[in-house]
């Protein structure tokens, strides 16, 4: 009990910096110039259709909120204010998005500054198992081969809007900000229909990317807080005769096992278990739990996660969202790669004096391949090819100049090769390059009233250079002074780039 209280207090020590003395101070935007609504252009004022807003507009709206009874008049007389005037769609969307994005910026400031102003006496210890997302790549290369079972987790959402607000109460103790958050969430959907309406979730996520990302990260952080605590406790179980599990509000103790107490529900018991080698990796909405334990231990972890989501976060999730597989006999989809750990045989001939014999050695190899069907589906959705992979023209780009068209196709191709450079089999990437090249030729050919073959012959090396230039330059700079490296023969070489996390959604460059 005392151990968990100390662990929880260290987690709560950050929360005092989330108390806002004044919500939306007039010049609060000046403290976060890098978190502007428009990225590198914080003063640009663009229309609502472009989804870009100026920090100046946010400030003006914040000043309006300081006016007396602004929100009260908005609720009592919705037709007198543009924010709630549903008859005027442009102003309704424009002002609501400005307000939601501005709210997200203000909430993000304490999170970004908590390390700078955290007192030394309350400094939170750094755990070795909490590392950067870039540690995913060495984990795959070095440690994945020594594990046996893998649980592929699709982190469920949505959850009820009120649950999102309640989760923030542990970190944000400013009541007006929570009321404003409820106000913004109510604006986009009905409280009762949100949990069943995927359309409302899609609209909210699309129109309020920053706010949705903050709410989702808060939810995932709370879920991982419990997961980390249980993981730390499980490593000490053989030395303990009893244990406790604590719910954040209501605490309970039971010898030799722990119980979870929830108001309105019966007691649910989850037994302690020991898993000596457990690895947890999350990327966006997917996570994996890999271990060297038994299948029974993986089922217990699955049971724990389902009960955690059901009784603490108050929403039901399907057990099929957690897949338990044996690494030697299955593959899994993570970060856009289709990965597996197959076993291969290596025959070694050994000779001792006059006797010779063969040694069959079983070796594990981490294999990553590109999901060809999925990427061709993306290209088909973006109208670069048919569903079967046959290249077609892109008529929507015919109004652009020739070099702009070449640059767009080349950039998409380079992004694909850059992101999937960690693949051990790159033949699929060359097939995608072939599709993009022909699609580019079919787009430019009719524009110049020429056939595809004649147009490709007319462009010659310039056309090919636009698709190969970036690869040759990158690899020549990396390996020219160290070792001989030929990209054209590197179909099985894996090179992980740390900046691929910036282009994680490959649908965006295709649109």
From Swiss-Prot:
GO biological process: mRNA processing; RNA splicing; tRNA processing
Superkingdom to which the source organism belongs: Eukaryota
GO molecular function, one term: RNA binding
Coiled coil: none
GO terms under cellular component: chloroplast
Localization per Swiss-Prot or TrEMBL: Plastid, Chloroplast
Any Pfam family: MatK_N
InterPro entries associated with the record: Domain_X (IPR024937), Maturase_MatK (IPR002866), Maturase_MatK_N (IPR024942)
UniProt keyword annotations, A-Z: Chloroplast, mRNA processing, Plastid, RNA-binding, tRNA processing
Record family assignment: Belongs to the intron maturase 2 family. MatK subfamily.
Protein name (database record): Maturase K
């Amino acid at each position: 009990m005392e151990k968990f209280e100390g662990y929880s207090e260290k987690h709560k020590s950050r929360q005092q910096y989330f108390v806002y003395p004044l919500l939306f101070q007039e010049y609060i935007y000046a403290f976060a110039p890098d978190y502007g609504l428009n990225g590198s252009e914080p003063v640009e004022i663009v229309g609502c259709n472009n989804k870009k807003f100026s920090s100046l507009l946010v400030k003006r709206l914040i000043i309006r909120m300081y006016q007396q009874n602004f929100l009260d008049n908005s609720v009592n007389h919705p037709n007198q204010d543009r924010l709630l005037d549903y008859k005027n769609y442009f102003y309704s969307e424009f002002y609501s998005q400005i307000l939601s994005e501005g709210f997200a910026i203000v909430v993000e400031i304490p999170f970004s500054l908590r390390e700078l102003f955290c007192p030394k006496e309350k400094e939170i210890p750094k755990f070795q198992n909490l590392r950067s997302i870039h540690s995913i790549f060495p984990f795959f290369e070095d440690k994945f081969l020594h594990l046996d079972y893998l649980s592929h987790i699709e982190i469920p959402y949505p959850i009820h809007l009120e649950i999102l607000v309640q989760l923030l109460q542990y970190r944000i103790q400013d009541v007006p900000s929570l009321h404003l958050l409820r106000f913004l969430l109510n604006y986009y959907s009905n409280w009762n229909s949100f949990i069943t309406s995927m359309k409302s979730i899609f609209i909210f996520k699309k129109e309020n990317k920053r706010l949705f990302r903050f709410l989702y990260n808060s939810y995932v952080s709370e879920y991982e807080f419990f997961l980390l605590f249980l993981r730390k406790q499980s490593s000490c179980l053989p030395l303990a005769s009893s244990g406790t599990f604590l719910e954040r509000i209501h605490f309970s103790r039971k010898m030799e096992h722990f119980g979870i107490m929830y108001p309105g529900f019966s007691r649910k018991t989850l037994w302690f278990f020991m898993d000596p080698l457990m690895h947890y990796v999350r990327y966006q909405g997917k996570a994996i739990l890999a271990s060297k334990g038994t299948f029974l231990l993986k089922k217990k972890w699955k049971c724990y996660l389902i009960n955690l989501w059901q009784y603490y976060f108050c929403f039901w999730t399907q057990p099929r969202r957690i897949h338990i597989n044996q690494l030697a006999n299955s593959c899994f989809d993570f970060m856009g790669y289709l990965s597996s750990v197959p076993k291969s045989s290596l025959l070694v001939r050994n000779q001792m004096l006059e006797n010779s014999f063969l040694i069959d050695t079983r070796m594990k190899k981490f294999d990553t391949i590109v999901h060809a069907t999925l990427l061709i589906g993306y290209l088909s959705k973006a109208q670069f090819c048919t569903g079967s992979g046959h290249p077609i023209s892109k008529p929507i780009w015919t109004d652009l100049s020739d070099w702009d068209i070449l640059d767009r196709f080349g950039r998409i191709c380079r992004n694909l090769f850059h992101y999937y450079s960690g693949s051990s089999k790159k033949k699929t990437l060359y097939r995608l390059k072939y599709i993009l090249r022909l699609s580019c030729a079919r787009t430019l050919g009719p524009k110049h009233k020429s056939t595809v073959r004649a147009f490709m012959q007319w462009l010659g090396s310039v056309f090919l250079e636009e698709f190969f230039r970036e690869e040759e330059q990158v690899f020549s700079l990396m390996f020219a002074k160290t070792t001989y490296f030929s990209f054209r023969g590197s179909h099985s070489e894996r090179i992980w780039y740390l900046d691929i996390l910036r282009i994680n959604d490959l649908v965006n460059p295709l649109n």
